[in-house]
């Protein structure tokens, strides 16, 4: 049997944890403008599976691509890189 394909891994910030076992992660990347060459900030939200509800709003997390878990969930939480600072 062959190994699994390389899966996408993103690092982003949790913007919502209101759903049970699901977090919304905002991933920011930069793309180069095709004509002018300037780097433009680009962001996208992904829903990720958080089995134990450990991630909270503001945490920096790492998510990995997985099989479809629902109509919109295609990622799962790998680790919490940095906990949010509560002021």
Swiss-Prot record:
Question: Pfam families attached here?
Answer: Ribosomal_S17
Alphabetic keyword roster? Ribonucleoprotein, Ribosomal protein, RNA-binding, rRNA-binding
Molecular function as annotated in GO? rRNA binding; structural constituent of ribosome
Query: Matching SUPFAM superfamilies, A to Z?
Result: Nucleic acid-binding proteins
Q: Which domain of life is it from?
A: Bacteria
Q: Name one GO biological process term.
A: translation
In terms of PROSITE patterns, this protein maps to: RIBOSOMAL_S17
Q: Which GO terms describe its cellular component?
A: cytosolic small ribosomal subunit
InterPro entries, per database record: NA-bd_OB-fold (IPR012340), Ribosomal_uS17 (IPR000266), Ribosomal_uS17_bact/chlr (IPR019984), Ribosomal_uS17_CS (IPR019979)
Quaternary form?
Part of the 30S ribosomal subunit.
What does the protein in this record do?
One of the primary rRNA binding proteins, it binds specifically to the 5'-end of 16S ribosomal RNA.
Q: What family does this belong to? A: Belongs to the universal ribosomal protein uS17 family.
User: This chain belongs to which protein, by name?
Assistant: Small ribosomal subunit protein uS17
